Design a protein with these regions (language model features):
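Transmembrane core module of solute transporters
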Residues: 1-60, 66, 87-89, 150, ...
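Structural signature of transmembrane alpha-helices in multi-pass secondary transporters
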Residues: 10, 39-42, 46, 73, ...
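Small-residue-rich segments within alpha-helical transmembrane domains of MFS-like 12-TM solute carriers
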Residues: 11, 15, 81, 97-105, ...
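Hydrophobic transmembrane architecture of multi-pass small-molecule transporters
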Residues: 34, 403-510, 514-517, 529-531
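Helix-loop-helix hairpins in multi-pass membrane proteins, especially solute transporters
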Residues: 50-198, 214, 223
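Transmembrane-helix signature of multi-pass solute transporters
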Residues: 72-82, 99, 161-168, 235-239, ...
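Small-residue-rich alpha-helical segments with characteristic i,i+4
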Residues: 124, 133-139, 143, 283, ...
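C-terminal membrane-cytosol helix-exit motif in multi-pass small-molecule transporters
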Residues: 160-179, 204-214, 232-247, 514-519
Length: 531
């Protein structure tokens, strides 16, 4: 609980500001597009620091590094709340992302070292609660605070939690002996920072996060800026791999421990964690957007669609933590992905007549599958790993989840726009005067709008009678056309959501065969994990 507090706060902060962007833009005199940099700046800084955290602990120690990150996160949160202009707020969010990027991997490594292997699943259950539930709670909490108080309080909220976390960490957490030996060795031999490796890492993941966050908004490769950052990401990634392998061959300490990917368990767990982040963050954004834009739900009610699923995960995580010590991780992961696939198949029945209860049960079913994934995926990531590599494992698995979440969000935004346009284009071909059904429908709607008998739908009703010199007939025609287009757009958008969910279903189902490539862990695998 001591270290989970700060991680919950950090993951919460990655989504809590989403619903407050219009208020932030208005309060600081910025446009909506400019305000999105509040999100982008945080994500980019966070992605850069995540894999570098393990490297930094060898210089100053894990406890000290963790406390510095908590302190930086708390101070920068207060600065965000006090920011008088958007550029200052964006700068403070960069600092906040730097502080937040070191929290999750440090906590995971602390848990792996603190708890014996047979109790590690239960420890990861608490950590999983923070990581899995926070994205679902964030938008609801952010909306409530913004509506009832002020957007600045979404940042001030972090300060007391940081203070509590710092106090508890200083009293309870200690570095294990091997970390102290690493720090002593580093200080004795002198600090030799891998500056080039860190620069290439920052350019790779910073560019990737920027592209994922801004790609759809700027029309992907239709934008020279996006094309430039994609090129920079690819070139930097190739150069980073070459440089880090060169550092390994020369016996130096590279910033990324790429030798972990030689182990099938870790390589597959990295892939599975990416998909978990993709599905978790993607659907967490998908459902509220669907109910708000197409079903007319308020932000608060949209949040209540997600909340029961969060409660389900809170109940299931301790159960899965207990089972992880009794059941082979492959079986738990297989059950989780099968459950997730079936829940997405059910969710592919989205339509405009769904009730609140149906939506809630869809999410609860999905949450029950997600709960069976996080803990066992982390468990297999640590199998066969040396204790001195715990920091590297935690940094890379958290990076996989974050990049997966960003990719899922970008995928949803892109496919929603493109599939909606595709379905609209397909449907509009039949809406021509040559179609008898269309003519009859238009005639019926025009009569209803023109007659004002109360039978016409209210959509676009304000248009009727305001068509200019053409009189009421002209206005009724425009009102009828507006009503038909509104219906067409709603149906096209609904079909686009269904398409996205079907793609997600295929994506998740494709992970099940990967489990057959996992070597069966020996009976003492749990005991050897992290040692």
């Amino acid at each position: 609980m001591t270290v989970t507090l700060a991680t919950f706060m950090e993951v919460l902060d990655s989504s809590i500001a989403n619903v407050s962007l219009p208020h932030i833009a208005g309060g600081l005199g910025a446009t909506q597009d400019e305000a999105t940099w509040v999100l982008t700046a945080y994500l980019v800084a966070n992605a850069v620091i995540l894999p570098a955290g393990a490297y930094m602990t060898t210089f100053i120690g894990r406890k000290k590094f963790y406390m510095i990150c908590v302190a930086l996160f708390g101070i920068s949160s207060a600065m965000c709340g006090l920011a008088p202009t958007l550029p200052i707020l964006v700068f403070c969010r960069v600092l906040q992302g730097v502080g937040g990027g070191g929290l999750a991997p440090s906590e995971q490594a602390i848990l792996a070292d603190t708890f014996p292997p047979e109790k590690r699943g239960q420890a990861f259950a608490m950590y999983g609660l923070a990581v899995v539930c926070a994205p679902a709670i964030g938008p609801t909490l952010g909306g409530y605070i913004t509506d009832n108080f002020d957007w600045r309080w979404i940042f001030y909220l972090n300060v007391p939690i940081c203070l509590i976390s710092l106090f508890l960490t200083s009293r309870i957490v200690e570095d294990p002996p091997y970390v102290k030996k690493q720090v002593a060795k580093t200080q004795r031999e002198g600090i030799k920072l891998d500056f080039l490796g860190f620069g290439l890492l920052a350019l790779t993941f910073g560019s990737l996060e920027f592209v994922l966050d801004k790609g759809q908004e700027d029309d992907w490769f239709g934008s020279h800026v996006i094309a430039f950052f994609v090129t920079a990401c690819i070139v930097a990634f190739v150069a980073m791999i070459w440089w880090e392998l060169k550092e390994l061959r020369e016996g130096k300490r590279p910033i990324l421990n790429l030798t972990l990917f030689k182990r099938p368990q870790f390589a597959i767990s990295f892939t599975l964690m990416f998909v978990l982040g993709f599905a978790l963050y993607g659907t967490t954004i998908l459902i509220p957007q669907f109910v708000q834009t197409l079903l007319g739900y308020t932000a608060e009610l949209a949040g209540l669609v997600l909340s029961p699923a969060g409660l389900m995960m809170m109940c299931m995580m301790p159960v899965v933590g207990f089972l992880s010590g009794k059941v082979e991780p492959r079986k738990l992961i297989g059950f989780g992905f099968l459950n997730l696939t079936l829940s997405l198949l059910w969710m592919a029945n989205l339509n405009l007549q769904l009730s609140y209860g149906q939506l809630v049960f869809m999410r609860i079913f999905q949450a029950s599958g997600l709960a069976f994934l996080f803990i066992p995926i982390n468990t297999i990531a640590y199998i066969g790993v040396k204790q001195t590599e715990n920091n590297d494992v935690s940094g890379l698995t958290n990076l996989a989840r974050n990049i997966g979440g960003s990719s899922g969000t970008a995928f949803m935004a892109t496919m929603l726009t493109r599939r909606t346009v595709a379905h609209e284009s397909s449907a509009v071909r039949n809406l021509t005067p040559a179609n008898p059904g269309y003519r009859a429908w238009m005639h019926s709607l025009e009569g209803a709008f023109k007659g004002g008998n109360g039978t016409a739908p209210p959509v676009a009703g304000a248009i009727a009678g305001h068509g200019g010199g053409g009189g009421a007939s002209f206005g009724a025609t425009h009102a009828a056309q507006a009503y038909i287009y509104n219906m067409l757009h709603r149906q096209a958008a609904t079909l686009a959501y269904v398409d996205i969910i079907r793609y997600l279903t295929i994506f998740c189902a494709a992970m099940i065969p990967l489990l057959f490539f996992l070597p069966k862990p020996p009976k003492n695998a749990a005991a050897s994990a992290g040692h």
